[in-house]
């Protein structure tokens, strides 16, 4: 697999990154479970999924008895590793990491930072699930979070891995048993990945995924080039 994961669920049935994340969260968490987000407040669309104050949508994790806590980032926007050492414990079923800055101005995470978070999480709570919202992060570095300890990474084919060609879709990649649970959530228990028509989108998926590293590389080069120009104005 491209992300060095045991298994993956790649489907056009995922209508957005938020939908894919929702399936992953509900696939893994059960009533009474606790999740801890270690990268501050998630971006807006995920707040409704979690059921944060002011965004307590019908059907949220909170409504299903799944509790949420978070560790805020440091003033410079980087992870607070010391607070993670204090707060992470076996009571948390999931440690949630948002790799991208989302709609804020904090820096996105490097894979090496995710590796450090995963190491702390597994040391403090060996049975926890380390889940990474990998949207906008695919192919930005030579390795992915799944290479450095993340149990599950989630993203959208409309973004980096679709290469600008995939019109819809998302993916969940990680440990086999976790992916199976997500597949049961997407379709139904007992069926999982074994059902569902592709509806003619596979060509754009294959072409987009093939082109994705080149497209992302070009975007990175363009961003660096533009930044250099504007620095000199």
Feature-to-residue mapping (PLM):
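Conserved PLP-enzyme active-site core in the AAT-like
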Residues: 15-217, 221, 227-230
